[in-house]
């Protein structure tokens, strides 16, 4: 029996800063899409993954260093990651890699605090990202490599 070759990874990018709906005070605002928000958008798909954080040393918050350290080795399950402080904060230039066992399934890249880049072979994940973030556009491999 022949093994099915893995699907190629595809990438999209979208703006990290979003216009918010008016609040009780009536004024619209802007909000930053956090890692926590993205994980919630992935729903059950994300729950089965463990995460490894790749962050530069100069992150402004101690919470990111803690997350990176704890994600070494086997990684952090999604629910444990969501319970930490860092996923609710804005990072600068960070990769969050989601694994199913030893297989990398998804990379969420926070680039320059201005965009999120998503890389996966899973069409459902890309569809969900596009549904929640309609400005998501395809990226080339060269564009992906330039943001690292």
What residue spans do the PLM features occupy?
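Short, extreme N-terminal segment that most often corresponds to the first beta-strand
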Residues: 1-46
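Short, surface-exposed beta-strand/loop "edge" segments at domain boundaries and coil↔beta transitions
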Residues: 21-30, 59, 102-105, 117, ...
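Hydrophobic, Leu/Ile/Phe/Ala-enriched alpha-helical segments that form helix-helix packing faces
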Residues: 38-42, 85, 129, 133
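Surface-exposed, low-hydrophobicity interaction/linker segments
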Residues: 52-109
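Acidic, proline/glycine-rich low-complexity IDRs
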Residues: 106-148
């Amino acid at each position: 029996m022949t093994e099915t070759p893995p699907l190629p990874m595809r990438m999209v990018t979208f703006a990290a800063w979003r216009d918010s709906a008016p609040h009780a005070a009536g004024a619209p605002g802007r909000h930053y899409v956090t890692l926590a928000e993205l994980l919630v958008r992935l729903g059950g798909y994300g729950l089965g993954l463990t995460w490894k954080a790749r962050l530069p040393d100069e992150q402004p918050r101690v919470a990111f260093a803690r997350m990176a350290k704890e994600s070494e080795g086997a990684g952090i399950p999604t629910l444990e990651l969501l319970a930490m402080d860092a996923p609710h904060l804005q990072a600068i230039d960070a990769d969050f890699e989601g694994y199913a066992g030893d297989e990398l399934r998804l990379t969420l890249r926070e680039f320059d605090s201005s965009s999120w880049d998503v890389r996966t072979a899973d069409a459902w994940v890309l569809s969900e990202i596009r549904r929640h973030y309609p400005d998501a556009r395809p990226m080339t491999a060269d564009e992906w490599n330039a943001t690292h």
